[in-house]
Regions:
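A short, structured active-site edge motif that brings together acidic residues
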Residues: 209-214, 224-246
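Flexible "arm" and connector segments at domain edges
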Residues: 1-119
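Conserved Lys-Pro-Asp/Glu-containing loop-to-beta segment of HAD-superfamily phosphomonoesterases
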Residues: 240-272
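Active-site neighborhood of HAD-like aspartate-dependent phosphohydrolases
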Residues: 119-172
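Short, acidic loop-to-helix structural element flanking the phosphoryl-transfer center
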Residues: 175, 179-209, 215-224
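Acidic, Mg2+-coordinating phosphoryl-transfer loop and its flanking beta/alpha structural elements
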Residues: 260-299
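Short acidic-hydrophobic, aromatic-tinged amphipathic segments that line or gate anion-handling sites
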Residues: 237-241, 294-306
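Anion (oxyanion) recognition and catalysis
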Residues: 86, 197-200, 228, 272
Length: 311
């Protein structure tokens, strides 16, 4: 057995775990109880790693670091992690993909965490259907799944009507789309990414603000994977269901120069109502904000850069 290969390591650990329990015959409740036991054991082994070094600062005498203990306690901890993955049927490919996503997040967060707003003008970019073409991809995926055409050009923001016709919960579909990592493969909107890059060259602070649910971890990490994969050079990334409230808590809200780019009629109207200029790309579902004070409505296909002087 090759322990340096993740799939082989999972298989080898399962052979040992099967001596004690058969996870395939467990109920979810039994799995939960088994998980508690494994996590407590993992905690014990992780604590054992610390015991290999001089972690008690109040002790005057230092003992030699026990590298052998570090190694073998790390092995024990790793095997408990393998057992946890086996318990819930998480295979090597899924785990490796999650590792890659986490790596994207950590690198992107590290890049932006060292940046601080220094008084420059701010552009607040929405993601879905501004930088990334979410609606088209989601409707195509949904149509294929349910066998019923879900029109991306519906005048409804949440497109509920078409889902109701076939007795489908659109939120359930959305979660399944997210859990299947559909957000990673969204197409770029080259015009609005071009706008972002243009504003960056003009000295703007680029803030990504999305109403995607950060509590859904596949969604959260896929957002960073998409940003990194598509070379989106933002200065900050935020997840907020109420975007104006989020904005009102930022250091540039009082006295700074800023504007937003958002396709949602709800968020655009909220921004505009509170005196924030907002660039709104024309969509089938946001006609009601056209003509509102503080809204610059960009006709479909037009280069948004041309409308910056109106901001």
């Amino acid at each position: 057995m090759n322990w340096s290969n993740l799939d082989d390591a999972l298989t080898a650990q399962k052979v040992f775990s099967d001596l004690f329990f058969d996870s395939s015959k467990m109920s979810d409740k039994q799995r939960e109880e088994s998980l508690k036991t494994l996590v407590l054991a993992l905690h014990s082994e992780a604590t054992g790693i610390v015991e290999a070094v001089n972690y008690k600062d109040h002790r005057c005498a230092d003992e030699p670091v026990d590298q052998s203990k570090i190694l073998y306690k790390a092995v024990d901890a790793y095997r408990y992690i393998l057992a946890i993955l086996n318990l819930w049927g998480i295979d090597g490919n899924n785990f490796a993909a999650a590792l890659s996503q986490k790596d994207d997040f950590l690198h992107y967060r590290h890049k932006v965490s060292g940046r601080q707003w220094g008084g420059q003008p701010v552009a607040l970019f929405d993601m879905d259907d501004v930088l990334a073409n979410f609606r088209k991809s989601f409707c195509e995926w949904s149509s294929k799944k349910c066998g019923h055409f879900i029109d991306p050009e519906s005048d409804e923001y949440y497109n509920v009507r078409e889902f109701k016709k076939i007795g489908v919960n659109s939120e359930g579909y959305f979660k399944e789309f997210m859990d299947g990592h559909g957000l990673v493969s969204l197409e770029r909107d080259e015009q609005y990414i071009g706008l972002l890059n243009h504003l960056k060259t003009q000295g703007y602070w680029i803030q990504i603000i999305t109403s995607r649910p950060a509590s859904e971890l596949a969604c959260f990490y896929d957002t960073y994977t998409w940003l990194r994969k598509n070379n989106i050079d933002a200065d900050g990334v935020a997840f907020a269901a109420e975007k104006f409230i989020w904005l009102s808590k930022q250091p540039y809200y009082s006295g700074g120069k800023y504007f937003a780019i958002d396709d949602s009629a709800k968020h655009s109207a909220e921004y505009a109502k509170h005196g924030v200029k907002v660039l709104v790309p024309e969509k089938s579902y946001n006609k009601e904000v056209k003509g509102l004070a503080n809204v610059v409505y960009v006709p479909h296909g037009e280069d948004p850069i041309k409308f910056i002087p109106e901001i």
